[in-house]
Curated annotation (Swiss-Prot):
Keyword annotations from UniProtKB, A to Z: Ribonucleoprotein, Ribosomal protein, RNA-binding, rRNA-binding, tRNA-binding
One Gene Ontology cellular component annotation held by this UniProt entry: ribonucleoprotein complex
Xref: HAMAP family: Ribosomal_uL5_B
Stretches that traverse the bilayer: none
Organism listed in the record: Micrococcus luteus
Single GO MF annotation: tRNA binding
Protein name: Large ribosomal subunit protein uL5
Family the UniProt entry places it in: Belongs to the universal ribosomal protein uL5 family.
Subunit and interaction comment: Part of the 50S ribosomal subunit; part of the 5S rRNA/L5/L18/L25 subcomplex. Contacts the 5S rRNA and the P site tRNA. Forms a bridge to the 30S subunit in the 70S ribosome.
Annotated GO biological process: translation
Function: This is one of the proteins that bind and probably mediate the attachment of the 5S RNA into the large ribosomal subunit, where it forms part of the central protuberance. In the 70S ribosome it contacts protein S13 of the 30S subunit (bridge B1b), connecting the 2 subunits; this bridge is implicated in subunit movement. Contacts the P site tRNA; the 5S rRNA and some of its associated proteins might help stabilize positioning of ribosome-bound tRNAs.
Name of the coding gene: rplE
UniProt keyword annotation of tRNA-binding present: yes
Length: 191
């Protein structure tokens, strides 16, 4: 008989911090009667628009490779919904790629994002706190994929930016801002 080795599942560091410290602090701060009212994270969507892929299909493959290395899962390819003659775009052509992260992958990605890539950005003074959508969700853009240490700078063919959306259960922007600040997001202090 062969023995099946049981590997112990490790809870992501940021998730543990949220459960043990942040949730209690937010419950006190906003005077929630129930712990389930405390805002939490739902998902993180990483989107990479690749408009040049309409002309050259190899470009989308490179974008998929980069996003796979960054997020740790294979992204979906976004296709054009309509044909637009001015952009030489036909319906069904690949124009971008996105990955939706949930669960432990989401927590690990956010932990890596806050600790490594954001401080590596040149002239970085913090994230703008004006990019909330009114419902506690936060979207920001990165201008290049090389800030992630998973990307080998010698092997990139072109610089690609990406949008990162953090979806929360917060009811308004103040709750969302408090949650993300507690998770370690570096917001600008003076406007």
């Amino acid at each position: 008989m062969t023995e099946v080795q049981q590997t112990e599942k490790v809870t992501p560091r940021l998730k543990t911090k949220y459960r043990e410290e942040i949730r209690g602090r937010l419950q006190e701060q906003f005077q929630y009667g129930n712990v389930m009212q405390v805002p939490g994270l739902v998902k993180v969507v990483v989107n990479m628009g690749v408009g040049e892929a309409a002309k050259d299909s190899k470009i989308i493959d490179d974008a998929v490779t980069d996003l796979t290395a960054i997020t740790g899962q294979k992204p979906m390819i976004t296709k054009a919904r309509k044909s637009i003659a001015q952009f030489k775009l036909r319906e069904g052509m690949p124009i971008g790629t996105h990955a939706t992260l949930r669960g432990d992958r989401m927590w690990e990605f956010l932990d890596r994002l806050v600790t490594l890539p954001l401080p590596r950005i040149r002239d970085f003074r913090g994230l703008s706190d004006r990019q909330f959508d009114g419902n506690g969700n936060y979207t920001f853009g990165l201008s290049e994929q090389t800030v992630f240490h998973e990307i080998d700078q010698d092997k990139i063919d072109r610089v690609r930016g990406m949008d990162i959306t953090v979806v929360t259960t917060a009811k308004n922007d103040d709750e969302g801002r408090a949650l993300l600040k507690a998770l370690g997001f570096p917001f600008k202090t003076d406007q």
